[in-house]
Amino acid sequence: MLMPKRVKYRREHRGRMKGRAKGGTEVHFGEFGLQALESAWITNRQIEAARRAMTRYMKRGGKVWIRIFPSKPYTAKPLEVRMGSGKGAPEGWVAVVKPGKVMFEVAGVSEEVAREALRLASHKLPIKCKFVKREETGGEA
C-alpha cells in the first residue's frame, strides 16, 4: 500500500478541489496513459487495486508507472459517536486528483493490450477516465 514514510502533521484540512490539474497532464514516462476527467480523492487501496488489475491483464509484461501518490491523510470518527469532542483518528491516505491529471502510464505493450489494461484499471477508480497516447496529450482532457 502506498503511504508517506513520515509526515509533519497527523491531520490535514480537507481542502477544495476546484479547477484543473496544474501539472502532470501529459504522458511523460510511458506510451499510453489514463487521464482523469473528474476531480476526486483516490485512496491508496483504489490505486493498488487498479495497479493489480493492470499488471494481471498484461501478464507482468510491459512497465507501469503510477503518477499519483496518496500523501493526504483522511480522518474518520468511529460509528455511533456523538458530534464534537475533536477531529477523528487518521483512517487512511488519499491522493487529490483533478481533471486532466495522468494517473497511470504503461509502456512495452501493444495499444490494444494497454487500452484494455487501463480500462480495467479505470473500473477500480471512482471517477471517469480517458485513454491517452503520448503524442495526443496537449493538457486538455
Swiss-Prot record:
Q: What is this protein called?
A: Large ribosomal subunit protein uL16
Q: What does the protein in this record do?
A: Binds 23S rRNA and is also seen to make contacts with the A and possibly P site tRNAs.
Q: Which family does it belong to?
A: Belongs to the universal ribosomal protein uL16 family.
Keyword Signal among record annotations: no
Q: How does it assemble?
A: Part of the 50S ribosomal subunit.
In terms of Pfam families, this protein maps to:
Ribosomal_L16 (PF00252)
Which species? Geobacillus thermodenitrificans (strain NG80-2)
Query: Which GO-annotated molecular functions does the record name?
Result: rRNA binding; structural constituent of ribosome; tRNA binding
Protein origin, superkingdom: Bacteria
Mind telling me which GO cellular component terms the entry cites? cytosolic large ribosomal subunit
GO process annotations (BP): translation
Keyword list (alphabetical) reads: Ribonucleoprotein, Ribosomal protein, RNA-binding, rRNA-binding, tRNA-binding
